[in-house]
Amino acid sequence: MKDQLLVPLRRRPWTCRKCLQRLQLLPQHQTRRSFETAASPFPRQLDSLPADYSRTKTVDDDTLRRVFDSQQFWREFSQQRSAQPKPTGLVQNQYLTSPDGFRTFANVSLQKCQAIVSKVLAASTLEEYRTMARDLDRLSDLLCRVIDLSDFIRVIHPDPQVQEAATQAYALMFEYMNVLNTTTGLNDQLKKAAANPEVTSQWSDEEKIVAQILIKDFSNSAIHMPPHERQRFVNLSNDISQLGSSFVNGAEPAKSHVSVATNNLRGLDPILVQQIKRWNRTAAVPTTGMIPRLALRSVHDENVRREVYLASRTSSKRQLHRLEELLLKRAELAKLSGYESFAHMTLSDKMAKSPEAVSNFLTALVDSNRKLVREELSQLQAMKGAPLQPWDHAYYVHQRVMQYSQARRSRELSAVPEFFSLGTVMQGLSRLFDRLYGVRLVPQEPAPGETWNPDVRRLDVVDESGRHIAVIYCDLFSRPNKHPNPAHFTLRCSREISTEEVAECASLDQSSHPNDGMATAVDPVTKTLRQLPTIALVCDFSEPGTNGGGRPSLLSEHSVRTLFHEMGHAVHSILGQTRLQSISGTRCATDFAELPSVLMEHFATAPSVLALYARHWRTDEPLSEGMIRSMERDRTAHGSIYGAVENEAQILMALVDQAYHSRPADGGRIDSTALYQQVSQQHSSLPEPADVTPPTSWQGFFGHLYGYGATYYSYIFDRAIANKLWVDVFGAGRQAVDRAAGERYKNEVLRWGGGRSGWECVAGALGSANESNADGRLVEGGDEAMREVGRWGLGRDGVSG
């Protein structure tokens, strides 16, 4: 629903390539800790005692490690509030103490929304127009409160009754949101307010930004069109949704398998050969799933690899038809909305601004990456002794990796996970945040009913003054039927709560709360009440041992980077605390949203950061300098074998995405295969074969064409920026724990959320003395700025094998 009005910048978790691959016992009866918080700004009996964060950092730090590494410790710690007589709702939401509470939550929120809509529609005085941006931001917040939380709970909660109740609450508010999308009076009133200098002169910068975001969202919802065109817009939007879902779920090859003589499968695991073997000494190699990937990597016969490669990259005609219909409908939608193409419509509010600028970035990136690609391919071609073909790449990469592993890879690397228990990694994240930003993670015993599973840990984020600033629910361990992909969810955005809201709440019901019972705090400067960001982190790590001395969950280097990536999103939500929720935290342009998370990956294995946390789970000895050097050599070696070609593959996918979505709306029928082949021939170092019939049509398997249409470049764009900031702000790791570097990054990037242009953030972090930003030329963005980021390149992005 990210493009729906009045929930202007709601972001689904980005499922990036990285994410898809990555104590001393406390007294048993300790008083609940207290922080400088206003759980209620008006007199009423609190459901729980206030907390106290006056204990030492050392105790909290030790507890943080143990709540994740010891199940016994966690059970004892988490049961300290089990005697609390009144259950707390899910994530402290006062309504969600039972499945029926979702209906109440949705209805109460709906009534508040309706009151705001009536107020906005009836506005006629200057004072009423001056509050309009804030009023509509609150309307957006009320919708998000229900939609975001219900959407998360219906996916994560194990109880079918709760899932169903959350789904119904989600549907109710989503339907109401669609009603608002057709309420032309809201658009008219907001435009009237935004056009009046006597109104806008009194607006803060945040109010002006939010007003423009909402006006853009109204426009994208066709509210300004005549009724018949608006209906056409709705019909097209529905068609696109249905086609997109069919395209994502309907990926299929033209052929289900390739028949191969079994004696030509030498190199493939014999157990797998037996699984696909048929009675007549042939085998049916499937064209989807793991087996074709393993065949391309290990089968010695080049002809077999060629057959498997071509078949596994050729989509069915039915799937290609779905894609081409989707592209046609999107082009028509853009034309109806007054745009040259779907890409022009989608990119108008992104950092890139236009498909031409994206093209500048991608072509510059191809150029900066080409030398590294040639180096990698020349090494593989030398192994083959003949021209390298697309179906050779995986095979010879595997051969090189095996050679490296046998000849050079240090045996001590197999012991690295022993130094990465989940508890020590969380401890390291807290210590890093404390060093860079002056905030840390403090375990908090959950109240009865607060979490959706007993394994969910609650962490409170506190600053150096002991002030509570955020809540994180960590659902990090695997369990049956849990989705395996790592993700960050914003369950409640940060926002300033007005005194009018507090008074309204008090007048309605003494038991009600202006933030539905969820975490709030008083801003020490403005003395206003704030709703605190509430975040959920979901991963799928193995559980620690159940007995007191059991083995903790040990993470691979890749899993550590994954956790740092997701915490990068979290710290953006934590520190990007704006006054208005529409631009808080991660609610920023799509092509800026991945920057904090990608940058965080660099910190995971920086030597000075490893020194903060990498300790053996049993002996507590630190990771040795020799092991750190071995890890670095391993990443560099693997990156030099395939890193640049992997980068090229991502660039090509982004180019294909742009080619499809930048076509003019009146361009007629789209031949997606011809365009795909054109991009491959023009930009790939190992282009698809031009002499096969039918030609390969891998685009039918590219599901992100629906979810990230015209914006697939965003991830590699943010990687290029992150690499630049890592080198120029954090000294390529030399200042990885330096407070001055952290404050600079926080003040120029993180604290703004979506309330500042991404270009201004990047330019501010680099400074005007930086050669890439000489005279502040990055501030305004534009085609040349995009080209400049492309010149920064991606390096090889070496990863552990």
UniProtKB/Swiss-Prot annotation:
Positions that bind Zn(2+): H565, H569, H572
Disulphides: none
Keyword Mitochondrion: yes
Principal location: mitochondrion
Transit peptide start-stop: 1-42
Any single biological process term in GO: protein processing involved in protein targeting to mitochondrion
GO molecular function: metal ion binding; metalloendopeptidase activity
GO cellular component terms, A-Z: mitochondrial matrix
Cofactor (UniProt): Zn(2+)
Entries under PANTHER family matching the protein: MITOCHONDRIAL INTERMEDIATE PEPTIDASE, PROTEASE M3 THIMET OLIGOPEPTIDASE-RELATED
Family from the record: Belongs to the peptidase M3 family.
Protein name as annotated: Mitochondrial intermediate peptidase
Organism: Neosartorya fischeri (strain ATCC 1020 / DSM 3700 / CBS 544.65 / FGSC A1164 / JCM 1740 / NRRL 181 / WB 181) (Aspergillus fischerianus)
Classification of source organism: Eukaryota, Fungi, Dikarya, Ascomycota, Pezizomycotina
Annotated gene: oct1
